[in-house]
Amino acid sequence: MGFDQYHEPPEELSPEARTFARMVVSLQEEAEAISWYDQRIAVETDAQAKAIMENAQQEEFKHFAMDLEFLLRRTPKWKAAMEKVLFTEGDIVELGEEAEEAADEAPEGSG
């Protein structure tokens, strides 16, 4: 049985690496669901249906945030990079360059 989230044989991966891969896929799925709700909300004309979709989309935002936080806690290099870019002001590309340097100094870690 094949799984799209793996690029190596799953049986050769540690349990931590498999969990990490599952969480990355979960994050992707949540982002996709958020986009689908955006599209549905954009074209929905019934106010009550639209409100329900907006409420459901909020759940997807929560799930996305939880998945991302899990991955960041397990991957210090990601967290170091993102802390320099997310929720900041300034040129995003310049911040990204600074984030790359910060990530290089962070400890290793991932699934």
For each predicted feature, which ranges?
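Iron-associated oxidoreductase/ferritin-like identity signal
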Residues: M1-G111
